[in-house]
Every structure is written in structure tokens, then in C-alpha cells.
Regions:
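Conserved alpha/beta enzyme-core scaffold
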Residues: 1-343
Length: 343
């Protein structure tokens, strides 16, 4: 892989490394960070999420110098430090849709490093439940004259379905271990506090019921998980079933299962997936967007579009907010970025 990257990359190239909220092209990310900075340097990284240490190692080692991104949650403190040291020049902090759009305008990757669950002998890719950003990255790169390199967990004779056709992919590399997928941090409802339950009840009665919020996008957090859990109990006691919260842009949160099983929820389109939810998703293809094989195909670009144009409401979080409601996710000590929240 090192020899391949040294042969393909040139100083100043725009490189899209697939760092999603969950799925990470971690093998290729580490290979990129291990390159010789005398041969490959001043890369312009264009990627939605900075999640792994290797995503910033490329700047610390002088392999990359410029960055356009959307979210850096786990690496936000280190990112701020590297910016302060002058090792990273930030082009812009985008929403997901802004960044995806610029992939087709002025930030078209010359090389894309992506992750897939499997490839067949022809090079077709199966991206599975955590498809996330892969389609938009590959399409912009492949049809923009760029080079697509995919790391895969396995190479098989027949795929469950084809998510990315082989003629959009230039190189396939079987990684030594499965790519990293970050679980959602709201997996354990026991961590929901009594205050968050109270806030959820206030939101359901004072906002959802009052405004008839029926199409919505929940950000990931225990505040929203509390609302999801209370739908078939508290919300139903208010006579709200069939009136609110039927159609969702949302990852397949375990906290949503009771609302689905009670018939509160009619449809869910997802940005990503959730480890351990595969069998449940396959069993509820009437609710989730699944393929003929039963597995879900998430799509962050389409879910962000739905969140912006097709939803009544969004709940998210921020680092700072003033009395006028202006907010920021870039502070002196942290540069987290908004992800898709401003949509």
C-alpha cells in the first residue's frame, strides 16, 4: 500500500480520506500517515470527519498542510493545537452538504481512500449498512478524473448487493483486519438522567405536540434518546400516536425500538448504522431502507438533504451559545465543527 500511495500521490494533491462519523478507512489512513514526507507533502485533505489520531498525524508529519472538513469531535482539542502551531491551514469548516457539494465544484479529490465491507473478484464494492459517505466520495472522484482506492474487509465471489460498481474503482486492497466502525455513544439508556427525561417530556408536550412535529431529524445524544424512549409511553398517553414523530432522518438508535414496535414510527432513513442492530433492521424492512439482501444502505448525503428540506424540526447540540441564540463549535481550545447541524 505504501508503494502504491507513493506512486500515485503528488505534492499538493487533494485527497479525500473516508473518515465518517462511524466507518473509517483506518488501514489506508495509517498507510497515508506513514508515508515519506520528503516524497509526499503539502496534501490538501478534504474529508467530512476527523475521528482517528492518524487523521491528524498526516499534518503533524508534514504530509498534509491544508484541511477542509465538517466535524472533528474526538480530535477537536488536538486540531485546535495544530492550527495554533501553524501546522494546519483550514480552508473552511463546512456542513456535510456544503463539503459534499464542493467535491463536485472546486474540492474534487484527485485521490480518494474509501472503505467497504467487501469486494468481488471484479472490483465491485458492497458497502453494507454503514455506507455513509462512500457514494458521494466515489462518484465525485471517479467522474472527476480522480483515482479511487478502496480498503475492504474481504474479497468474495458474490456480493450481497453491488453498492459501488467496479468501473468506478481503480484499486482494491484487502485490509489485515475489519475497518473500524464507531458505535453510537447512546447505546446504553441507563445513562439517561432524570433531568433529560424531564426535558424530553417538556419537548414532547411543549414543542412536538404544539407544532405537530411529524417529520424530524434527531441529533445523537441522550437528550434525544430520552424523547425516543418516551414516545410509546408518555407521548401515547397524551394521545399523540399518529400525530407526531412518524417519519425520521435518524441512525437506527436502539432507543427507537419501543416506538417502532408500538407502531409510533412509520419510516426511518439513516445517515449511518449501529453495530448490533443488523438483525433488527433486516426484520423491519417496512420501516428502514433495506436492500433485497435485508441489510440497510445508509447514505449521509441523502439523509442530510432530507434533514434540510424534508423535516419539520432538528435537535442538536453546540459548544457555545449566546443570549441571542448564536452558537459556535470553534473555541480557543477546541475546533469541533458542526457536522450537519446547521442544515
Amino acid at each position: 500500500v505504501s508503494e502504491l500511495l507513493h506512486a500515485l500521490l503528488e505534492p499538493g494533491d487533494k485527497v479525500c480520506l473516508e473518515g465518517n462519523n462511524q466507518k473509517q478507512a483506518d488501514f489506508l489512513a495509517q498507510a497515508l500517515a506513514d508515508l515519506d514526507p520528503a516524497r509526499v507533502h503539502d496534501l490538501h485533505m478534504v474529508q467530512s470527519v476527523l475521528s482517528l489520531p492518524s487523521h491528524l498525524d498526516v499534518f503533524e508529519r508534514g504530509i498534509a498542510s491544508k484541511l477542509d472538513f465538517s466535524f472533528s469531535g474526538p480530535q477537536s482539542v488536538r486540531l485546535a493545537n495544530l492550527v495554533a502551531e501553524g501546522r494546519i491551514q483550514i480552508g473552511a469548516i463546512h456542513t456535510y452538504l456544503e463539503l459534499f457539494g464542493r467535491y463536485f465544484i472546486d474540492l474534487t479529490p484527485r485521490v480518494a481512500l474509501v472503505a467497504a465491507q467487501a469486494a468481488d473478484r471484479h472490483g465491485n464494492l458492497y458497502t453494507g449498512p454503514n455506507t455513509e459517505d462512500t457514494p458521494v466520495i466515489v462518484e465525485a472522484t471517479a467522474f472527476g478524473g480522480g483515482i479511487v482506492i478502496a480498503q475492504v474487509n474481504e474479497i468474495v465471489d458474490t456480493l450481497p448487493r453491488v453498492d459501488i460498481p467496479a468501473d468506478w474503482v481503480n484499486f482494491v486492497v484487502q485490509a489485515p483486519k475489519p475497518n473500524h466502525i464507531e458505535p453510537l455513544f447512546t447505546r446504553d439508556p441507563a445513562q439517561i438522567s432524570e433531568i433529560q427525561v424531564l426535558m424530553a417530556m417538556m419537548a414532547i408536550k411543549g414543542i412536538y405536540a404544539e407544532y405537530g412535529v411529524n417529520r424530524l431529524n434527531h441529533g445523537i445524544g441522550f437528550d434525544t434518546a430520552a424523547i425516543e424512549l418516551l414516545l410509546p409511553t408518555y407521548a401515547e398517553s397524551l394521545g399523540l400516536k399518529g400525530k407526531i414523530c412518524q417519519h425520521w432522518a435518524l441512525n437506527p438508535h436502539p432507543a427507537l425500538i419501543p416506538a417502532i414496535e408500538s407502531g409510533f414510527v412509520r419510516s426511518v432513513h439513516s445517515f449511518g448504522s449501529e453495530l448490533g442492530m443488523e438483525k433488527y433492521i433486516a426484520a423491519r424492512g417496512d420501516v428502514f431502507f433495506t436492500g433485497a439482501d435485508g441489510s440497510m444502505r445508509s447514505n449521509r448525503a441523502f439523509s442530510q438533504t432530507a434533514g434540510l428540506y424534508a423535516c419539520d424540526m432538528f435537535i442538536g447540540s453546540t459548544l457555545q451559545i449566546d443570549l441571542q441564540g448564536n452558537s459556535s463549535t470553534a473555541t480557543r481550545d477546541r475546533i469541533a465543527g458542526f457536522g450537519g447541524a446547521p442544515n
